[in-house]
């Protein structure tokens, strides 16, 4: 009877245990132990950066570039340029020496001397590679100061709201004064510094404004000088272009006038067909071609090769002839060549002395040339011809 009661109690207890809430799983302690083991395994393995750096420093093939010091407590980068060019790409996939130095700083390495790249760490020693697992990366928490600064900056405007009275003077309300007085004693120390900071900022901004204004004035002056120089250059270019065009036009006119003059002189054309030109110099009265005199008027055989005075290519050395009947004078200009020395050929010297040199009026060549002493020319001509010889 007692055995049955005990069995019932045991069965009831099992049922009660079965009907109750489930207990936590038994493998929980084992999992915690496994987690501890993983953490210990992670701490025993150094980071890849430290492992590669140790291999790089401990390699004797590159001792001329990077190596341990004499006692093995530090390592020295002897040739930073070659180290960044040849070794960093092989181990760290980059060639930035500054990035390598920043990585060393994050792991607690410090520079020993300022004149060379020598770094040291208490757990980075020659022959003690097992100490690398004790080197941990520094935790950088920059957002905390930034958040604190932002909170302080946000608290300052709320602590100093400004209201205006009826007369327009700004005052602080009583509630705001109570808040500022009941707060911690630090705000009174910060509040006086705010005007000083703003004042320094105002001074700095004022200096920057003055500098900007000075630069604006200098830029404006330079712009004015540049515009003046551009205007001067444009005027010079315009003047030179006008001068060049004028010179070309003058040269073309001179060449065309010279060509027209040569054509008129050589072809024997009258002055009426050509454009009247200004009177030339005395030396320009000579003909430009030797055939102009013979083309203008035929001469006798004994006077053919002799020089005679010409005006605009027409000989003016022949005298006016009279008709046999003594009629009206011929309006056409009939002249004959006279020798330059004034000596007649075929007569004695006495008749040459009595013969006077003909004087002509300066008339255009297309009008008949009349002699002032025509009678003397007639008598001289008759004497030369032999008709009035007495």
From Swiss-Prot:
It is found in: Nucleus. A motif (Nuclear localization signal) lies at residues 318-322. One of its GO terms (cellular component) is nucleus. The keyword Cell cycle does not apply. One of its GO terms (biological process) is regulation of transcription by RNA polymerase II. Residues 323-350 have a biased composition (Basic and acidic residues). One of its GO terms (molecular function) is sequence-specific DNA binding. Exhibits temperature-dependent phosphorylation. Keywords: Coiled coil, DNA-binding, Nucleus, Phosphoprotein, Stress response, Transcription, Transcription regulation. Homotrimer. Belongs to the HSF family. Class B subfamily. The hydrophobic-rich region (HR-A/B) corresponds to the oligomerization domain. This is Heat stress transcription factor B-2b. The lineage of its organism: Eukaryota, Viridiplantae, Streptophyta, Embryophyta, Tracheophyta.
């Amino acid at each position: 009877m007692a055995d049955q009661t005990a069995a019932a109690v045991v069965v009831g207890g099992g049922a009660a245990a079965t009907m109750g809430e489930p207990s936590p799983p038994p493998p929980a302690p084992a999992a915690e132990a496994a987690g501890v083991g993983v953490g210990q395994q992670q701490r025993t393995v150094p980071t890849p950066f430290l492992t590669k750096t140790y291999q790089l420093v401990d390699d004797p093939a590159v001792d001329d570039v990077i190596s341990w010091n004499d006692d093995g407590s530090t390592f020295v980068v002897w040739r930073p340029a070659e180290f960044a060019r040849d070794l960093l790409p092989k181990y760290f996939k980059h060639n930035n020496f500054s990035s390598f130095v920043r990585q060393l700083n994050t792991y607690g390495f410090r520079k020993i001397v300022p004149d060379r790249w020598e770094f040291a760490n208490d757990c980075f020693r020659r022959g003690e590679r097992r100490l690398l697992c004790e080197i941990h990366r520094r935790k950088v928490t920059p957002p905390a100061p930034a958040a604190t600064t932002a909170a302080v900056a946000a608290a300052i405007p709320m602590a100093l709201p400004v209201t205006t009275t009826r007369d327009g003077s700004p005052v602080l309300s009583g509630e705001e004064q109570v808040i500022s007085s009941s707060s911690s004693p630090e705000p009174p120390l910060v509040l006086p510094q705010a005007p000083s900071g703003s004042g320094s900022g105002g001074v700095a901004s004022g200096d920057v404004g003055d500098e900007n204004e000075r630069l604006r004035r200098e830029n404006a002056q330079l712009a004015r000088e540049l515009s003046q120089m551009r205007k001067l250059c444009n005027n010079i270019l315009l003047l030179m272009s006008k001068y060049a065009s004028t010179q070309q036009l003058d040269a073309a006119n001179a060449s065309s006038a010279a060509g027209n003059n040569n054509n008129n002189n050589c072809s024997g054309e009258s002055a009426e067909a050509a454009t009247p030109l200004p009177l030339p110099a005395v030396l320009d009265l000579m003909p430009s071609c030797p055939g102009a005199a013979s083309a203008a008027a035929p001469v006798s055989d004994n006077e053919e090769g002799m020089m005679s005075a010409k005006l605009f290519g027409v000989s003016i050395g022949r005298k006016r002839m009279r008709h046999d009947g003594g009629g009206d004078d011929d309006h056409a200009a009939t002249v004959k060549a006279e020798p330059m020395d004034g000596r007649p050929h075929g007569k004695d010297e006495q008749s040459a002395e009595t013969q006077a040199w003909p004087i002509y009026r300066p008339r255009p060549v297309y009008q008949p040339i009349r002699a002032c002493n025509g009678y003397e020319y007639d008598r001289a001509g008759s004497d030369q011809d032999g008709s009035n010889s007495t």
